[in-house]
């Protein structure tokens, strides 16, 4: 039976803004990959439409400043693209009663890549308004550059 996982998306103050659950697909020292099903109402973001039942394969890292979600359509299984959140490195912990808990502080800056390669860098104004120190700003910008390079090369979580 797959191991369950609960994901907490945190704001900069460390408060939970969204929580969801999924199933662990694999885990290593610095990464957990999970599958979660989108349970919210349909959302058309302009560059992707997400709907109830869409399957997300989510990659979280304890040593990287981002997470990556590969999104698949609920009805036909077609790949929609990768949604990437720039975050502080995730905390991945075993829960006392079993399963895992993943917690990541969202830094507002996001990256989306469509299957054809078109890129969208999102929420730059919101990111710029956060009270981050120079080291965090640098780490976040480096994370975005790393994501773009990995996506262009089809490596890491972008390998299909």
Q: Which positions does each model-derived feature cover?
A:
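Long, hydrophobic N-terminal alpha-helical segment
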Residues: 14-19, 141, 150, 154
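Short acidic-glycine loop/turn motifs at beta-strand connectors
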Residues: 27-30, 74-76, 114-118
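Short, well-ordered strand-loop elements centered on a beta-strand within folded domains, enriched
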Residues: 32-36, 78-85, 118-125
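A short, polar/proline- and glycine-enriched secondary-structure boundary/capping micro-motif
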Residues: 43-49, 95, 130-134
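Phosphate/ribose-recognition catalytic cores of enzymes acting on nucleotide-derived substrates
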Residues: 49-95, 102, 108-109
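A hydrophobic, small-residue-rich beta->alpha segment in the mid-to-C-terminal subdomain
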Residues: 103-148
